[in-house]
Amino acid sequence: MTLGRREFLQRLGLALAALGMADATLAGLGNTYQQALARSSRRLALLVGINQYPAAIWQQKAPSEKGAFLQGALMDVELQRELLIHRFGVLPTDIVTLVNKQATGRGIVEAIQGHLADQAQPGDTIIFHFSGLGSQVHLTGRSASEHLPTLVPADGTLPRDEGDTIHDLFEETLAQILGSLQGVRVVTILDASGAAPRTSPLQGNFRVRSRLTIPTGTWQAAPGISLPVPQTPADDLSRSWPGLLLRASKPGMPALEGNWHGFSAGVFTYALTQQIWNSFPSQRQSWIFQRAAYKMETWSGAVVSPELRGELASKDKSDLLNTGGIPKPAADGFVKTIDAANRNAFLWLGGLSASLLPYCALGLRLQPLPALPGLAAVPQGTLIVKGLRGLTAKAELLGAESLSEGTPLVEIERRLPRDIDLCVALDPTLERIERVDATSALAGLSEITTTAPGEQQADCLFGPLAAVDQPSGESPAIDINQTDADQPENYAASQSGTAGIPLGYGLFSPNHTLLPGTAPEEGEAVKTAVGRLTPLLHELLAVKMLHLTTNSMSSQLPVRFSLETMESPGQLVLIEETLRSRQFAKTKTVQLSQPISDANQPKFQIQLLNLGQQPLYYLLISVLEKSRLFVYCPFVEPASSTEKIAEVVAHTSQLKPGSRLKVPMQTDNGLPWQRLQATELFAIACTQPFYETWKAIRTPEFRQSSDQLASIPDPLAMAKAVFEDLHRASQGKNTVSSPQELLVTLRSDAWATLLMRSPIIQRKVV
């Protein structure tokens, strides 16, 4: 039986505790620190990352042929090391790293013995991280369907015939070695996979951390270690793994590696470490890891399958809290080094939203936080980013004598171009003439750029499709105001043609999942397809721009966004809130008394709460199936002109201090759970009305929908207007922005954008 998403998130929450991130409320932080400081437990970490594999190791081709090597495994090691040292307080001397040629099979085993086993004392925590290639292997003489999971070391040669030895590190061998350590807590993170055989190392715009083939050979014990021959399948092995096991994907599914601005990293490792940086000590572990999984889904464009397994995964999390970790404030990064004489500093921005990285050098501003919240004064000063390399930024220090190394930092101002580009990767299966035509056609569109797959971060892919292509795991096309009973027939039923016969071209998510509504009804030329898909490209760009405004961690406005059932009594399903809101209402996320299932399908209501002392103006926007945008528009009396109506709506969309907005109000209009599975919900609150935004929405084509969300006629114009309104609010009430200005400036004290994704649905496993 596969692990359900809800169970995964519950189990995954335990991992944060095992790494030292215990639950604590702000009021109880003092006791938490005292208890943590009194503990003597130690954490020892071994971090392994391999980018440089000879081609002969992972594909059955001549060694002279160029292979598609990994690019992000070493970055994973850096991400984990910075997190362990500066978030959890692990001593640098307690962390050993093995990279590339150092990470031979023997080298890994000897490091486990020398650094972990020989030094660990009862009560300590052992952390083993591996980023690189994984594999499935078949041992000679075993059943043809019996495949065992392995990790591929730097010297893990690929057998040429069935009599050759497989020199991989078998996962079962690793589990047996780690399980032999007595009295310690073991946390294993594997950002590698033994995916099913494939013909390409790429999946959409991502690299797959797996061998392309399943080799057959014999097993040989590591020198000096007496262990039985591996025989346990991956699922059974995961269940009995010592301590906790965090996998980037289910066994047999691909672990992905992607490109971001100036660096590559494992999707799982980057999402996990970034979310831990963004999480406050009082937030629930399940909340933290739910959002790490959401980050993975946002980047890949489809449902992901990370797992948390192991012997301790099903035990009470209280067994894992005594780890010696000191909670620290949520942060976008920290000060790595400081040059007080030249007023410069180098920063680590491991917690900053990945979507903001390309724009950091435009003048991102950060301010320091106290290292221990509530126990130290807030340091003074502002840091302005001048350049970025990977996640290390060079910044200018303003308004402070100096800052100490390790000082946490949080964003206070971001600057973005008025004109944001949508990056489209061209599918590698396109023929040369098709690529030329696609490049030419897309170049004729404003605000659209193209790239080859796997070379840089892309927002979507353009490529050919056949009748067998369909949105994996997606619902059929849904009307935002449609009830469950009114859903149209399955999306695949609308596809014409015979399986395998090209139908034309479509748009895909970054992991190559077909986007709903992009398949043609009949064959077409490339330029025809680009013309047909242009409106959808603009809608995707609008969604990208909305994502660029999200700031739940850094916003200084106390706002809470929730999803509740409409049945009486209502139950809270999900909460998104700015961290500032927790200073005003210290409540914990409430879970449903019963999981939502196929047989239990309540209607839902959105609620937005202003916890501050000043009135705020709001926008509620939903994105259905990644590109169809809808907005909640309060009812107003007809006015003399469209512009006048927009002005009235802008003033009417106000949340007074302490007030709550509920949408929809009537149960009959409640949001069905099926629709929410394909929906993102944005709540944007601002200190000034959204004049320009409502002008862009309330055009003659707009159709008011009472107590429901209504379709936005021109989503891209709306998104650009949101930028303008937030920029104006950040400048002050009497400031008039000029369209000639190339940048918009958004200050964290002027707005908050909260993003909520679909609730977790527990489906019956058969």
Identify the residue ranges that each predicted region occupies:
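C-terminal segment of N-terminal export signals and the immediately downstream linker at the start
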Residues: 23-62
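Secretory-pathway glycoprotein ectodomains that are cysteine- and/or Ser/Thr/Pro-rich
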Residues: 501-605, 609-619, 623-766
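Glycine- and acidic-residue-enriched helix-capping/strand-helix junction motifs
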Residues: 55-78, 259-263
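Beta-strand/loop-dominated core regions that host nucleotide or nucleotide-derived cofactor-binding catalytic loops
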Residues: 362-417
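Caspase-like cysteine protease fold
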Residues: 31-38, 45, 234-241, 279-346, ...
